[in-house]
């Protein structure tokens, strides 16, 4: 897997304009939709249990995000996820805040038990709690802690039979056999709500067009990180508001050439 190979997936997303069905949280809906549009994908936010199965069946990818968790939303996620599985639509799961409360942790473990996942994406604490490994968490954004991130990612990939993506200062992608570390991004991303949630949906757009889910995830993370770096270079001194606007611009303007030039990945 080389940078040229990875960068081509960016062009493929823009050429294909994949439909990404998001059942996401109320905090990030607008930002997620705008980010996907900027990238070149087609977002749809359909939540009603009466329509999610049908919508998921025609999507390029389905993204399930439990940031603002409600019982009716969980029901919709299960209906959509099972429909996606029946129709060979890849499902991505973002277990936001797994470990923060008993209910949230229960749901985070129930969804992978019921739905076949292409990708699970979270911080180290969230992924550890999904697979019942000890890792402290405070609130839905906690990611720091004591533990081996690569080991947790590999364990999650093996136990859940999926590609595990753990994001943080460095990002890890693994299917249990192939493991890649991505070292792009910028710390100002943590000052904008929803950047992690948008990232999962961006990975969804890449997974919709690239069936090697490890390659798709690595391409998405590299693209996202480079876009953040380019946006930060123009706006970081102004603050997070200016960065957010420029980040959307860079999601639209970052090219495959930029990925080849600035991408930083390591196969381990």
From Swiss-Prot:
Its cofactor is Mg(2+). It comes from the Bacteria. Gene3D superfamilies: 3.40.1190.20. The keyword Acyltransferase does not apply. Substrate binds at residues 45, 194. Its EC number is 2.7.1.50. InterPro entries: Hyethyz_kinase, Ribokinase-like. ATP binds at residues 121, 167. Catalyzes the phosphorylation of the hydroxyl group of 4-methyl-5-beta-hydroxyethylthiazole (THZ). HAMAP family: Thz_kinase. Belongs to the Thz kinase family. This is Hydroxyethylthiazole kinase. It comes from Bacillus thuringiensis (strain Al Hakam). The lineage of its organism: Bacteria, Bacillati, Bacillota, Bacilli, Bacillales.
